[in-house]
Amino acid sequence: MSKFWSPFVKDLVPYVPGEQPKLSRLVKLNTNENPYGPSPQALAAMQAELNDDLRLYPDPNGERLKQAVAAHYGVQANQVFVGNGSDEVLAHIFHGLFQHDLPLLFPDVTYSFYPVYCGLYGIAHEKIALDERFRIRVEDYARPNGGIIFPNPNAPTGCLLPLDAIEAMLKASPDSVVVVDEAYVDFGGESAIALVDRYPNLLVTQTLSKSRSLAGLRVGLAVGHADLVEALERIKNSFNSYPLDRLAIAGAAAAFEDDAYFRRTCQAVIDSREALSASLQALGFEVLPSAANFVFARHPRHDAGQIASTLREQGVIVRHFKQARIDQFLRITIGSPEQNQALLDALHFLK
C-alpha cells in the first residue's frame, strides 16, 4: 500500500479476472471463451484495416458497428451504444443510469463485477437471493429500488429467465432502469432486445467475446431507448471519446454481418454442451440446466475444490468459486470436442 494512495483506493476491492495461464498445453475451460475462431469475414475486415489509415483516429461513434447491430436486431442506430468490452459499457451504466437514493438490486449469485462497480461509484445495493434452484423470483424485485441488473443467462449458473418474467419485472419497476446483461444469450436464450421498443426503462447489454469469438478484441454494446443511449454517450465522451479502434470496429461489424458462421458455431457449442452435460451426469455430477456456453456442476461425493485441483494437475483448468451457496460447484466452459474429451478423461478418478 502506497502513501500516495487515496483513502478511496485503499478501501477499493477490485474485480479478479479469470486466470489466463501462460502455458499453451493446458486445456483451458475456465473463462468461457469460444472454442471456434472468429468469423473469417471478421478476420478479413480487420486485415483490411492494416494500412496507412492507422495514423488517423477511428470513428468515435463506431457508426459502422452500430449500423450492423441495428440491422441485426431490427432497431435504430441511435438505440445502440458500443464500447471497449461489455465491462466498460456496464461501468458507464453504473455511473450514469442507476439512482443513488435507493439500493440497486441484483442476485446473490451473479457476475462478480456488479458489487465492484457499486463500490467504485458509491452505489448502495442489495443482493436478492436466488431460489433453491438458482432461479430469479421476479416478485422479490417488486420493491423500491434505484435500478435492477442481472445476467441472463445467469453467470455463473447458466440458468435462464424467460422473457415474460423479464416483462413482469419491467412493469413492476417502471421508474427504474432494468439492465439485462446478455453475455451468453446466443447459446440458448431469447434476447430481451425484442422488448426495448415497449419499455423505455429497459437496457440490454451484450458482448462479442463469447458467441462471436472476439474476446481478444474487447467489444461490447448496449441496446435500449435512445434516451438511455444518449446518457451513455455523454459519459463516454467525458471519459474516452475513442473507445474502439479501427480494427475493432471493422471486425465486430463484420462478425455481425456473417450470420451464417455465427449460427453454425453457436449450434456447435450448444450440441457439445448437451453432450458434455450427459457425460458429466453419467459420472455422477448434478448439472444445472444451462443456456450458456458453460455448465455449472457439482458432485455429491467429491469436494469441488479438490476436483479442480486434481484436474489442474492433469492440465485441465476449470473455474471454482469460493463463495457461499456455490462453493461445491464447478463452472466448466464448453470447449472443442477434443477439449471436452480431455476433461472427461481427466475425470477418470470419479469412476
Curated annotation (Swiss-Prot):
GO BP annotations listed: L-histidine biosynthetic process
Pathway membership: Amino-acid biosynthesis; L-histidine biosynthesis; L-histidine from 5-phospho-alpha-D-ribose 1-diphosphate: step 7/9
Any coiled-coil regions, as ranges: none
Pfam families: Aminotran_1_2
Catalytic activity: L-histidinol phosphate + 2-oxoglutarate = 3-(imidazol-4-yl)-2-oxopropyl phosphate + L-glutamate
Family: Belongs to the class-II pyridoxal-phosphate-dependent aminotransferase family. Histidinol-phosphate aminotransferase subfamily.
Cofactor: pyridoxal 5'-phosphate
GO molecular function, a single term: histidinol-phosphate transaminase activity
NCBIfam families reported in the protein's UniProt record: hisC (TIGR01141)
CDD domains, per database record: AAT_like
Gene field: hisC1
Residues where N6-(pyridoxal phosphate)lysine is found: 210
Subunit architecture: Homodimer.
Catalytic activity, EC: 2.6.1.9
Entry keywords, A to Z: Amino-acid biosynthesis, Aminotransferase, Histidine biosynthesis, Pyridoxal phosphate, Transferase
Name by which UniProt lists this protein: Histidinol-phosphate aminotransferase 1
